[in-house]
Amino acid sequence: MATGWVVLIAVIALLVGAAGGFFLARKYMQDYFKKNPPVNEDMLRMMMASMGQKPSEKKVRQMMQQMKNQGK
């Protein structure tokens, strides 16, 4: 009977730990994306304009493709 209780408690602890880890990781990622949003085309245009470059559509798409390839 004691072995059954140990197994039951271990399974419950595993489930609680997995659920807790999931929600903690989810909260962390939500906060991270709130502080550091992913770069999009509008942000690239603003960055290029602030550097004194004329943000043509071709340049913006090239930079987005380079950033996507760099992440791989």
Curated annotation (Swiss-Prot):
Q: Where in the cell is it found?
A: Membrane
Q: Which residues cross the membrane?
A: 4-26
Q: How does it sit in the membrane?
A: Single-pass membrane protein
Task: Tell me the keywords, alphabetical order.
Answer: Membrane, Transmembrane, Transmembrane helix
Q: Sorted alphabetically, which Pfam families does this protein's record hold?
A: UPF0154
- What are the annotated GO cellular component locations? plasma membrane
Q: In which domain of life is the source organism classified?
A: Bacteria
| Main localization category | membrane
* Keyword Zinc-finger attached: no
Mind telling me which HAMAP family this protein's record contains? Answer: UPF0154 (MF_00363)
As for family, the record states: Belongs to the UPF0154 family.
* The protein's name: UPF0154 protein EF_1734
Source organism (scientific name): Enterococcus faecalis (strain ATCC 700802 / V583)
